[in-house]
Amino acid sequence: MDKRVYIFFTLFIVTIISHSQEKCDFDSFIKNEFPAKEKNFMEGKLNLKNINIGFIFFKPIRYLGFIDSKIKRRIDVKFLKISKSEINDSIYLAKGKTIVGKNTRLFEGKIQIRQIYSFKYISTGEEGEMDGIVKSQGIIIADYHFREDKKLSATGVFEGKVLLRWYINNKGVFSYDTINNFSDDYNNNQFIGTWTSYKTGVKKVANWGAHRIPCSGDLDIGAAEFMPNEKYYKYGWEDYKP
């Protein structure tokens, strides 16, 4: 192959990949995670009145995240309090904080459950250790809207959708789903959305999650676990440790 043609072809492919990464959104993420969604999903029947999903947001030891799809600046997210609404079983009130560089900002807002799906075929673990233990398994899709303090600089609004994985054991206990955490691409609590600056109105992609970051493109080059690409080290990832 002519060298010039090869270079052109390579650049063309890289451009397509980069473009597709920028276009990644919640719907495309779901399609990628569950390619046979229509075939393997059914509408869930969780009794929202009898369960409290608040604990799910505290299960991850830490959240991995980035803000701004161009430079993928590191953002650390931590929830401080999640409480179920007393008037609507699908709504949870949230308080937390974010750390971007040297800036720590508090936020508060709400998470509202929109859809519940159950899997037709449940997982039993790497060696079948969960066989007979899992009664049902599925995902929750919710909207979130978190507001930072307008009085502080570099603040705005986080909003988007979150994917939560759950299962119910044979004793009827609603649980955070770690059944497939042996898998290299295991993830949970996947937040996909934007951050909009109060001051400028500029909107930036802001995604975070447990174990992996959704729609992270070339930021994550790890095989068995998340590992940041060296090209993004200067945006807060240089001191990252698994």
Language model features with spans:
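Tryptophan-anchored aromatic micro-motifs
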Residues: 22-80, 94-98, 121, 128-154, ...
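A mature extracytoplasmic/lumenal domain signature
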Residues: 81, 98-100, 111-115
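Bacterial Sec-dependent N-terminal signal peptides
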Residues: 1-25
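Short, surface-exposed coil-to-beta transition loops
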Residues: 104-108, 156-157
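Exposed beta-sheet edge/beta-hairpin loop segments within beta-rich domains
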Residues: 179-185
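Extended lipid/amphipathic-ligand handling interfaces
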Residues: 111-115, 160-169
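Short beta-strand elements
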Residues: 207-219
